[in-house]
Amino acid sequence: MESKKKRLMDYIFGAHNYEANFNPKRQAKIKDLGHGKAKVLVWELPVRIWHWVNFLAIIVLMFTGLYIALAFTSARFETHATSFLMGWMRWIHFVTAFVFMAALLFRIYWTFVGNRYTTFDIYKPGFIRGLWESVKFYIFLPNKKPHTIGHNALAQFAYWIFFGICSIILSITGLYLFFEPQQGSFMMSILGWVPIIFGNSVKLHIWHQGAAWGTMIFMVAHIYLAFREDYLVTNGTMSSIFSGWKFDKKKYVVGEENE
């Protein structure tokens, strides 16, 4: 009983320690810049490629998804090239959706094989305290935000809720809606449990669109907070999504960020 209570208290109030990966041997590359400064390869090449593939996929899915739902325009002149506009939008949406799902599966895989900054360990000690202090930091309140080189607690929480969960809901409901006309097919036999959880076709559309809007909100907030972090902390947050490198004091980069 005492150990359970202690673990709970450590999780809420303990020292910040949620940047450790499932594989502690995979430490990030570090380069000494002198004068007490260093840079660390936070985002490895596979993560950066995934980031940009994912970004482009979401943009395409947002546009085509809105068109499928609202059909906000149509061809002014019916020609061979324009008369199938909705069909083209649906085709692009479906192809991009499979790219999005493949990227999601790869990112889950890389969580286990990448460096220490590729994971989102919201169960680590001190996570709740770090989350609250990060919220205060972003809304300009006095705070004791723990020093982090990778994702801070708020970013990790947002990834879990608005990206991780929403992506899974989008993938499951999207797959079912795609294969729904093919009753009796192999894929429908695999996905038969989906309406039991999410409801009929109408409710599935609502779940799908709700998760899509959640992803859009996350994306806007993510871009704003990344620019804000880069401006306030000046650690190369924005340039790191191209180069992978972030800059900090050497004592933090070599593994003392939890102190």
Per-segment meaning from a language model:
Residues 1-259:
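Membrane-embedded alpha-helical bundles that constitute the cytochrome b-like, heme-associated redox core
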